[in-house]
């Protein structure tokens, strides 16, 4: 069950995509969105060597960085207010009253390293939603990697453009590995809601008892999920590109895979 969704924001372009996806998921599961705005300490925005420039100039640089930090937080808050309002999210409640059939949300702000803060916060969430620009941002990319490897929680990478639904036609990239199995287990709420899934495997997959996609299909049938199996030909492509391409060809809107 998905009840809490952590949606980190930074005041940059990916915020709208990340929050939009988080609220779509929240609507699907009547869940709570925990929007967390993380901005660097002013000293990190304006790295300076104290001995290299006069103190008044150093203070001015930190002041400018502080102003930029405030602008970033205000920008992220504006996007949050717009999207949460569009989805009719109510302020969060606690205790038994929090278990409801409506979307709730709250807003928090903190300063520090995105890649350090988000994995720790993620451990107290059911799902993390992050987005990045098509060209990628180094800070966000680092946060994505640390969430995958250090949080112990599933990560949903939001599409860069606007979408009206997500998880209605899921696919699983299956190779029988432990990380793939954990991804499937974490995605069961999506799979049960959809009731169907495409199982993808590649012609380069290593043989193994659990790697057989038919075995996964049998497991999912116990959860009431209808499956179809599709082979993705790698050829000269990266495995990830082959899987993504095959999922798109099958009309899927969510690809589930291990990190």
Predicted regions and their residues:
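Short beta->alpha connector loops
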Residues: 12-13, 111-115, 135-136, 177-178
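Amphipathic coiled-coil/heptad-repeat helices and related helical stalk/stem segments
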Residues: 18, 114, 140-141, 180-183, ...
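Small/aliphatic-rich secondary-structure junction motif
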Residues: 1-60, 150, 165-233
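Electropositive phosphate-/nucleotide-binding environments in soluble metabolic enzymes
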Residues: 70, 74, 112, 181, ...
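Structural beta-alpha unit
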Residues: 40-43, 51, 78-128, 223-255, ...
């Amino acid at each position: 069950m998905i009840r809490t969704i952590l949606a980190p924001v930074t005041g940059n372009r990916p915020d709208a995509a990340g929050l939009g996806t988080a609220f779509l998921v929240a609507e699907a599961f009547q869940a709570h969105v925990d929007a967390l705005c993380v901005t660097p300490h002013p000293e990190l925005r304006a790295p300076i060597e104290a001995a290299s420039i006069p103190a008044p100039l150093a203070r001015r640089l930190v002041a400018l960085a502080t102003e930029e930090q405030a602008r970033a937080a205000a920008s992220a808050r504006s996007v949050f207010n717009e999207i949460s309002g569009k989805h009719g999210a109510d302020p969060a409640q606690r205790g038994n009253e929090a278990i409801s059939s409506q979307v709730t949300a709250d807003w928090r702000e903190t300063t520090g390293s995105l890649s350090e803060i988000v994995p720790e916060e993620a451990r107290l969430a059911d799902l993390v939603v992050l987005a990045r620009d098509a060209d990628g941002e180094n800070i966000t990319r680092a946060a994505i990697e640390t969430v995958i490897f250090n949080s112990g929680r599933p990560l949903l990478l939001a599409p860069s453009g606007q979408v009206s639904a997500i998880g209605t036609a899921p696919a699983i990239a299956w190779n029988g590995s432990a990380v793939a199995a954990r991804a499937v287990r974490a995605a069961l709420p999506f799979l049960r809601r959809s009731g169907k899934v495409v199982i993808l495997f590649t012609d380069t997959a290593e043989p193994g008892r659990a790697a057989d996609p038919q075995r996964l299909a049998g497991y999912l049938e116990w959860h009431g999920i209808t499956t179809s199996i599709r082979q993705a030909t790698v050829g000269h492509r990266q495995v990830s590109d082959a899987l993504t391409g095959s999922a798109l060809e099958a009309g899927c809107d969510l690809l589930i895979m291990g990190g």
